[in-house]
Amino acid sequence: MVYKLVLVDGVEMDLTLDLNEKGFEMFFKPYQIASLDLLWNTDEHLSSRMVWEKVNEMLPGTISRASIINFLNASVENGLLDYIETTGKGGYRRLYTSKLSKPETTKYLSAIVKERLQTL
């Protein structure tokens, strides 16, 4: 099932809800959870390259850098992550950090789903 959730601030979040799974696996792919875990467990801002390299070390197979970049940017738009912009050799780049802790993210997603279920 795919739901388009419109948050309080008008931001839309596309979530695929897999009721056969539990926890974050209901909403996110393994590489996305690994990306979030990295950002939840560091105080540093990480570049997409850093996240991509670490995720590919953690998971079997190869995740494309584009998949990581797209997920990180979507997570910024959806209010899960924050970033600062720096300049470098090739122009501007984003360094990402978690906006919400893991428990806050759980609460945030739970509240959105609960709110939408009450409209049935």
What feature does the model see in each segment?
Residues Y3-D37, T42, S101:
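Short alpha-helical segments that sit at the start of domains
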Residues H45-V55:
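Short acidic, hydrophobic short linear motifs in intrinsically disordered regions
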Residues E53-R65:
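Short helix-coil junctions and helix-kink-helix linkers
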Residues I68-N78:
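Basic amphipathic alpha-helical segments that dock to polyanions
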Residues V76-T87:
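A short, conserved structural fragment
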Residues T86-K107:
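Short, cationic-aromatic polyanion-contact patches
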Residues P103-L120:
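Amphipathic alpha-helical dimerization/coiled-coil segments
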